[in-house]
Amino acid sequence: MYKRQLFLFCGAFADFLAPYGMNDTDMLRVLEAPSLAHWMGTDHIGRDVFSRILYGAQLSVIIGFLAAGLATVISIVLGVLTGYFGGKADMLIQRFVDAWMTFPDLVLLIVVVSIVGPGVNQIVVILGCLYGIAGSRIIRGSTIAVRENMYTHAAQSMGANTLHILWFHVLPNVMPVVTVSYTHLTLPTKNEV
C-alpha cells in the first residue's frame, strides 16, 4: 500500500525530487555505478537513472489520472442517458457494453494503438474509453433507481423539462456512485505502474 503512495508522491513531485533533468547527458559519466552523485548510476549515454525513473513515474501518474477523468465523463454520459431514457437505444448500447467487456483490455489496447499509432494522448483516450464504457453500467443502474424515486416523478408532474430533471435530480443523486467509481477507475494508474 505504501509503495503505491510513494510512487504517486514521487510522480507528482518529480520536478522537485529529480537531481538532474530527464534528458541531461554527461558523456564523461557513461555507465557509471551508483554513487552519491548518481544514486542509481547512469545509462549508456550518461543520463541519471534515478531522475529518469522519477520522470517516468510522473508520466504514468499523469496518464492514469487523465484516463480516469475521461473514463468518469464517459461513464456519466453513457450511464445517465441510457439509464434515464431506456428503450431500444439503452438495449443497443448495453449489448455493445457487454460485447466490449468480453475483450481483454490489453488486447484492445494493442490493437487500437497499432491502428492509431503510439503517443500519450492516444493512450489516455484508449484507457479512458476502455474503463469508461465498462463503468457506464454502474452509473446506469444507479440512474434507473433514481429515475423511479418520487422526487423525480414529482418534478415531472410539475412540468420540469428533461434537462432540468437530469441536472438537478438525477445527477446529484448519482454522484456518490460516481465518486466511488472514480476511485475505482484509477485502475489506469495501477496499470501504468
Where are the language model's segments positioned?
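Periplasmic/extracellular loop-to-transmembrane helix junction in inner-membrane transport proteins
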Residues: Y20-A68
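Amphipathic cytosolic juxtamembrane alpha-helices at the membrane-cytosol interface
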Residues: R47-I62, L66, G86-Q94, I144-E148, ...
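N-terminal signal-anchor/first transmembrane alpha helix
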Residues: K3-N23, F96, V174-M175
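Generic alpha-helical transmembrane segments of integral inner-membrane proteins
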Residues: R4-F13, F65, G69, V73, ...
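Generic hydrophobic transmembrane alpha-helix motif, especially the helices
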Residues: W39, D43, V49, L70-I74, ...
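Conserved small/polar residues in nucleotide/adenosyl-binding loops
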Residues: M1-Q5, T183-T189
